[in-house]
Amino acid sequence: SRRSGVPVHADDGKISINFWLTPDEANLNSETGGLTFWKERVPIRFFGESPDEKSKIMQKMIDDPAADPFVVPYGGNKVALFESRLLHKTNEVDFKDGYENRRVNLTILYGRPLQHH
């Protein structure tokens, strides 16, 4: 079934690891289910901001042409390892119906974002 993914966000960690656990056979469209990244890192202060302020910060960042989005396609039994402060989102999901075909993603965050002086 077709569903929207997790909207644009950044993780409050140093390194994020996403494990995609659902087999490829469940994915009805190889163009869906992956992650889009922007080459922009949120500032450390971002994590203490209100939800409205976070939205404004992220929108301004992804509107910048230098943000240059790129997609990492979904793959069952695949790992995506990235700097947590990079803006990213889950792309639209189009997987087969049924519990056993749900897109399962396990995310582990390591460390805290480093503060630069």
Located regions from the model:
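Catalytic core of non-heme Fe(II) oxygenases with the double-stranded beta-helix
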Residues: 1-117
